[in-house]
Structures are given as C-alpha cells and as structure tokens.
C-alpha cells in the first residue's frame, strides 16, 4: 500500500510504477494533492500485471485552487499470462476556482482475455445543490465549502493506517483551506 501527499512544491512530478510478479498480489496506490496559486502537479502511474489472480487499485484525488494545474497520466498493463487480473484506476479532480485546470489521461493495455479492469477520471466543481442545502441549514458558505473539500479527501485519508498520520493530514488540509476558501 502506498499513500502519496502532494502539497508544497511550485512544480512537482510524481511517478509510481507497480510491477506485479507474483500470483495473488494485492497492490493499493492512493494520492491526495492540494494545489494553489500557480502550482503544477504532474502525476504518472503504471500498474503492470505480469502474474495471474492479482489485484491493483489506484485512487488519486486532486483539489485545485487559483490558477493551479494537475496532470494525471495512468496506465494499467496486463500481460497475456495475467489472467484473473482485477485492476482499477480512478482520478478525481475538484476545481475550486474557474482558473484551475485538471487534465487526465487514464489508459488500459490488456493482452489477457479473462480480466476485470476499469479506469476513469472525473473533473468538476463543488456541487451547487449540496452547497445550497448546507447553507439552508445555517452553515456559512465558507464552512460548507471547507466541509465538502474535507469530505472529498476523506476517502484517501481513511486508507492511512496510522491514526496519528491521518489526523496530521486532516490538520494540514484544514489549515491549507481555512484561509483559501471564501
């Protein structure tokens, strides 16, 4: 299991490659990225399945403020002999400013015929209906937006096995967004 956190650099490139060589292997890759101002994050992943009956699961989440930008390029490669592969690749992007940008290029290269593989990417803004609902319950807009961002990242944070590290991540994200979301 791998959990990556991208927050501080002006420009950063993150590359991760998993190579599954043993039957029954189970690989998990998670990432959360908070980008602001003119930060750029380039994320590239490859999940290579060379053995049968193996699982890989990738979930990358990005929240983008200001003029920040993210690029996700992911590939699941399944070799001919890697039957019964179960592989997933998901990239989700939350645009918090109209000038923020997210680009995603998920891909599959499958040479085996008995597999369950999927990939997907979504990019969107804060759901206005959800925001309206929270505000109609007396929650100020700024707090409602912050709660939605925290909820967006919680799916990745809950994968962190150390409670102390998970709490530190929550604090880091909370501090990052307390002044940025209006």
Predicted regions, residues:
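Conserved beta-strand/loop scaffold segments within soluble protein domains that form the structured core
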Residues: 1-132, 136-139, 160, 164-182
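Small-residue helix-packing motif on alpha-helices
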Residues: 25, 144-145
């Amino acid at each position: 299991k791998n959990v990556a956190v991208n927050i501080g650099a002006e420009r950063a490139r993150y590359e991760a490659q998993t190579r599954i060589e043993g039957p029954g292997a189970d690989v998990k890759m998670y990432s959360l990225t908070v980008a602001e101002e003119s930060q750029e994050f380039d994320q590239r992943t490859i999940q290579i399945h060379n053995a049968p009956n193996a699982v890989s699961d990738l979930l990358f989440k990005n929240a983008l403020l200001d003029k920040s930008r993210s690029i996700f390029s992911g590939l699941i490669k399944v070799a001919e002999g890697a039957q019964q592969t179960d592989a997933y690749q998901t990239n989700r992007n939350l645009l918090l400013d109209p000038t923020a940008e997210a680009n995603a290029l998920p891909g599959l290269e499958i040479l085996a015929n008995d597999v369950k593989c999927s990939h997907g990417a979504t990019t969107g803004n804060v759901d206005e209906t959800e925001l309206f609902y929270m505000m109609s319950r007396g929650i100020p807009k700024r707090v409602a937006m912050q709660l939605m961002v925290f909820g967006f990242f919680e799916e990745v944070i809950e994968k962190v096995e150390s409670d102390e590290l998970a709490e530190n991540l929550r604090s880091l994200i909370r501090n990052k967004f307390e002044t940025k979301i209006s």
